[in-house]
């Protein structure tokens, strides 16, 4: 048997020379919107859905696939962008944050339960059992572990953080678009939130460049703290 070790680092210079000299370096890049859209189309999604999911995912194939196949997740993102653009008071932010957390928990719990049901069905199929067959005593422990309450709670907590992190990244995309407009760089890099172009254009006039950068930094700090919550 053979094994392949994949060592991941921000750059080759971040790897010790003694290790780097014994490896083959493969430089990865964020795929373009066109490449992601083409991949989604190859999976059977309509071109318009694939193109929008690719643009909103910012090169993340996993998130693009999620947007393309789950209309509810895409709708939640749309509502979040509108909500952030509509913030005027601190109380607005508190309400939006509360709704965001509630939606993240609900989405995480639903997805965890679906995956648990799929895992149970796979377990039955692999072991030659039908949907209504009794689980043999020797397999019962492994079967019950699939939907163990503590394990499901742990998975839901982790997935909730993933959903919140994705939401924070979506919020950051607003101020990224603001910075793009302020620097007249739309032709070079394009906008992510094209559907909200009018509101983002207005925000780019009201908010100075320093304010846009500060908000991006604040969101980045929130993401780091969220990821550090274990």
Locate the predicted segments by residue.
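TRNA-recognition modules of translation machinery and tRNA-sensing kinases, especially anticodon-binding
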Residues: 176
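Charged, glycine-rich active-site and insertion segments that engage polyanionic ligands
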Residues: 2, 10-167, 183-188, 192-230
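Conserved phosphate-interacting/catalytic interface
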Residues: 171
């Amino acid at each position: 048997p053979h094994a392949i070790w994949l060592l991941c680092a921000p750059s080759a210079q971040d790897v010790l020379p003694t290790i780097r000299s014994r490896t083959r370096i493969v430089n990865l890049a964020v795929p373009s919107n066109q490449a992601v859209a083409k991949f989604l189309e190859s999976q059977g999604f309509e071109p318009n859905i694939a193109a929008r999911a690719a643009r909103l995912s910012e090169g993340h194939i996993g998130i693009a696939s999620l947007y393309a196949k789950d209309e509810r997740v895409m709708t939640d993102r749309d509502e979040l962008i509108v909500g952030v653009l509509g913030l005027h008071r601190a109380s607005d932010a508190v309400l939006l944050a509360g709704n965001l957390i509630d939606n993240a928990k609900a989405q995480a719990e639903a997805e965890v339960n679906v995956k648990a049901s799929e895992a149970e069905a796979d377990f039955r199929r692999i072991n030659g059992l039908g949907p209504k067959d009794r689980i043999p005593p020797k397999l019962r422990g492994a079967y019950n572990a699939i939907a163990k309450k503590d394990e499901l709670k742990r998975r839901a907590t982790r997935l909730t953080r993933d959903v919140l992190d994705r939401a924070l990244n979506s919020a950051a995309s607003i101020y990224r678009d603001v910075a793009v407009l302020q620097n007249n760089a739309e032709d070079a890099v394009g906008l992510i939130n094209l559907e909200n172009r009018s509101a983002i254009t207005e925000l780019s006039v009201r908010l100075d460049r320093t304010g846009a950068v500060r908000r991006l930094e604040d969101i980045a700090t929130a993401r780091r703290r969220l990821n550090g919550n274990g």
